[in-house]
Amino acid sequence: HSDGTLTSELSRLRDRARLQRLLQGLL
């Protein structure tokens, strides 16, 4: 049952890291 929440957390962290990387590229 916790697998779904764990995968969602990982995807969220992945998206956040991607956004931070894009922001750093712009700066």
Swiss-Prot record:
PROSITE patterns: GLUCAGON (PS00260). Its main location: secreted. The modification Leucine amide is found at L27. GO terms for molecular function: digestive hormone activity; hormone activity. It is found in: Secreted. Keywords: Amidation, Hormone, Secreted. It holds the Pfam family Hormone_2. GO terms for cellular component: extracellular space. The keyword NADP does not apply. The keyword Metal-binding does not apply. GO terms for biological process: adenylate cyclase-activating G protein-coupled receptor signaling pathway; diet induced thermogenesis; hippocampus development; intracellular water homeostasis; negative regulation of gastrin-induced gastric acid secretion; positive regulation of lipid catabolic process; positive regulation of pancreatic juice secretion; positive regulation of somatostatin secretion. It comes from the Eukaryota. InterPro entries: Glucagon_GIP_secretin_VIP, Prosecretin. Belongs to the glucagon family. Hormone involved in different processes, such as regulation of the pH of the duodenal content, food intake and water homeostasis. Exerts its biological effects by binding to secretin receptor (SCTR), a G-protein coupled receptor expressed in the basolateral domain of several cells. Acts as a key gastrointestinal hormone by regulating the pH of the duodenal content. This is Secretin. It comes from Oryctolagus cuniculus.
